[in-house]
Amino acid sequence: MKKLLFTFLVSTGTIFFSCQRTYTQSKDYKNASLTIEERVDALLPKMSLEEKVAQMRIFHANIGVEAEGNGNLKLSDKVIEKLKLGIAGIKNPGEHMDPVAAAKFNNDLQKYIIENNRWGIPALFVTESYNGVDAAGSTRFGRPLTSAASFNPQLVNRIWDVVGREARLRGMHMCHSPEADLVRDPRFGRMSEAFGEDTYLTTQMVVNAINGVQGNYDGLGNGTHIGAVAKHFAGYGQVLGGSNFAAIEISPRTLIDEIYPPFEAAVKEAKTLGIMASHGDINGVASHGNPELLTGVLRDQWGFKGYVVSDSNDIARLFYFMNVAESPEEAAQMGLEAGIDIDLYAEDSYAYLPEMVKKNPNLEKLIDRSVRRVLRTKFILGLFDNPYIDIEEVKKGVRANSSLTLAKESDLESIILLKNENKILPLNKNKTTKIALLGPLVKDDTKSMFETVASKHISFVAEKGFHLTDEKGGAPKLLERDENAISKMVNMAKNSDLSILFLGGDEFTSKEAFFNNALGDRATIEPVGAQDELIEKIKALGKPVIVVLKHRRTLAINTISEQADAILDTWDLSEFGDESTARIIFGEVSPSGKLPVTVPRSIGQIPFHYSMKEINYKKGYLFMEDGPLYPFGYGLSYSNFEYSDIKKSNSEMTKDSEIEVSVTIKNTGNVKAKEVVQMYIKDVKGSVIRPDKELKGFEKISLNPGESKKVSFKITPEMLKFTGLKMEKVLESGEYTVMIGTSSVDYKKTSFQLKK
């Protein structure tokens, strides 16, 4: 066997030198003056079948892409073997290194890859982004659900612009983000990775995230930004029971009207370079084996030209988990025929393709189709012409002062004021006050961050008290109630003028439930541990209690809502989160965030989102107050805003015309503040049962005390279309109600008639 292997290598070497001579004569695909398609056409026919299949696989750097003590590249035998034929990409190389070291490391890695495959094909280095580049030394922003609360798409664009720049500077080329999923079930552990429950809000945020990370597409070839991979197509956030990998049962109409639009906009408007398929199925059809979805909808209907990548091991799972393939080989064929171009991580899926082609030569046409998409991406990114990073640029560009300032700005626009009894907030920083910072979400630097904001008149004591879980990564367990910790915090509160409690959840109470030996979803949505008990005991002291919520999933905070004098919902902010929270608490900035989700009173209300069909709202439940605890779009301010004078440009609209609806907003308070003006539309009578209302526009404005501003929204026929009885998009005549206001339940309204 060893002798045969040696013979094969020798013969391969012979082919190598032969092809090198041909390449020296032509150098066609290296010619930067050719179009990208011409370069792909020149390169693809030169490649062997095995080399093509290598361009359809991504492996993780943790299988043996390392640095020695001196920083030099160290590759395992397994990795060396994989790279002989080239590779589509590598996930997270150098992720634990500082940016400069990572850039040097990735330059060395790319050089090795280029010099050790026949055609000098560079690799895609792939990262992710949930709160900045998923790597050491990067600027840490709030998570997507946090930034969605800003209702400021331009801010999201700027955040992701930094992500794109910082990622490219460390040698990355693609980002398996953003999530274009809707998240409507707070049991789901990955809730904070997406932009909320609403189709329109998510679409605006996704388009701006992609435009930002890709540098408005121009940054790809310029070498300043990276390609986006919108995920998870489609319906992933709708898993039954909020359980990762669970089945997805969703009507075709809901899929088309609510789930698809963020992905469609990612393709058509933002020109995302990549799409990642969903872990799950849609009504029994596995997404990774669904040509109607990945080819019919994505490519034939929307015109997507980029590549589709599997989620981790999901082609193989068609065989061993979903049981829709008879063998690993059949799973590979299903993925290929469906339109999966790159196999992520799996060792036993597309590796079968060369042998399968011997039995079914027609498969090579599909392989060529996928490889063409991968090569095109590499040419778009300029990797054949400029594959390396300028180290001097890294030193200047990562964690720039402007990026750190942006992280703080995004925090301030995203914090939501849920309650402010008797206007206890903002606190007077010039009044002598002793404040206790208490609770399981207090961090080591919380006290120091508050001290940087407060004046010398304010003194702080801080105590975490107890942890929520044992903080084990796979399946964390809740800790037993700690009476001593609770008593200590109550005594500290007793000896203070007021308490700020840091409650909610952390990364161990809401996270991705990886496939093996890991949990992250929940069956309940109340705050875990003794948090409710803590606030009740401190409230009983008769002193003011302010709650700062930190969390990654929506929580049913009934007790907290009842007991607290004020609540600031901060979700999961940037690395400067506690400093930003202090700035809000002491009135440097008025809070302007709005809820990107509906907050239920109980898990029994789920599914529960503001845009559900109107018939869902006709009845409540026994023994529980009806409606949400806090509605979508809700958020208070330190000021007050008066809405008046709602007007429309016309009472009638046709399929060929538009109308404009406006409202005047006045800041009637005494502080400068921002307000999110929201427009909802309701189809009063439809051929199918329609949503109660749908967000169709919003604008964030800033007003000085006493200042007024007129805000206008354009309503187009396209905004009113939906999937009708025949499963085709329709525009129906009739009455439409327009609601403009401060939340999904507080608004002024008018109406118009659509006439055919």
UniProtKB/Swiss-Prot annotation:
Pfam families the UniProt entry points to: Fn3-like (PF14310), Glyco_hydro_3 (PF00933), Glyco_hydro_3_C (PF01915)
EC number from the UniProt entry: 3.2.1.-
Lipid-conjugated positions (S-diacylglycerol cysteine): 19
GO molecular function (one): alpha-L-arabinofuranosidase activity
Induction: By ulvan and rhamnose.
Alphabetic keyword roster: Cell outer membrane, Glycosidase, Hydrolase, Lipoprotein, Membrane, Palmitate, Signal
One GO cellular component term noted in the UniProt record for this chain: cell outer membrane
Lipid moiety-binding residues (N-palmitoyl cysteine): 19
Membrane topology: Lipid-anchor
SMART domains with a match to the protein in the record: Fn3_like (SM01217)
Subcellular location: Cell outer membrane
Enzyme category, top tier: hydrolase
GO biological process terms, semicolon-separated: arabinan catabolic process; xylan catabolic process
Cleavable signal peptide: 1-18
Its biological purpose: Glycoside hydrolase probably involved in ulvan degradation. Ulvan is the main polysaccharide component of the Ulvales (green seaweed) cell wall. It is composed of disaccharide building blocks comprising 3-sulfated rhamnose (Rha3S) linked to D-glucuronic acid (GlcA), L-iduronic acid (IduA), or D-xylose (Xyl).
Recorded family membership: Belongs to the glycosyl hydrolase 3 family.
Descriptive protein name: Putative beta-xylosidase
Organism: Formosa agariphila (strain DSM 15362 / KCTC 12365 / LMG 23005 / KMM 3901 / M-2Alg 35-1)
